[in-house]
Design a protein with these regions (language model features):
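Conserved phosphate- and dinucleotide-binding cores of soluble alpha/beta proteins
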Residues: 1-134
């Protein structure tokens, strides 16, 4: 089945971080909580443009990242608190280059993916992304 267009909510990064975050904040206010969020993890441990060891204002639904260690430098994302209002959070991780990040996360390391759980969380890790210790 097709997902209706009105149920898909993109950020508009081309507006620049300030205007894009204001626009997305308005979008999020109009749609309420998400039923489903699908996430993965980057080789460096980032998730949804939220990076390890970076501070994000949890009083807002949308956060701006102006010093991303990966291109592009400027990004916007939902805050941890906004993600956690979601009903279901699915974490799907694949790729051998993710092994170190997955290992750190599974050992309790402070990574963004561990801070997003929603009301119900499901985790799927493909064999190629699993560390050898498992």
């Amino acid at each position: 089945s097709k997902i209706p267009k009105q149920n898909i909510h993109f950020t508009h990064a081309e507006l620049g971080p300030d205007r894009a975050s204001t626009h997305y904040e308005d979008v999020l206010k109009s749609v309420g909580d998400f039923d489903i969020v699908l996430l993965s993890i980057g080789e460096d441990g980032h998730t949804a443009s939220l990076f390890p060891s970076h501070f994000y204002d949890e009083n807002k639904s949308v956060v701006v990242e102006c010093n991303s260690p990966k291109y592009p430098k400027n990004r916007i994302s939902m805050s941890y608190s906004r993600f956690n209002q979601s009903r279901y959070v699915f974490k799907v991780i694949s790729g051998h280059t993710k092994k170190d990040a997955v290992d750190l996360w599974l050992k309790g390391g402070s990574l963004p993916i561990g801070k997003i759980n929603g009301n119900f969380e499901r985790v799927y890790i493909c064999k190629d992304a699993l560390p050898l210790c498992i």
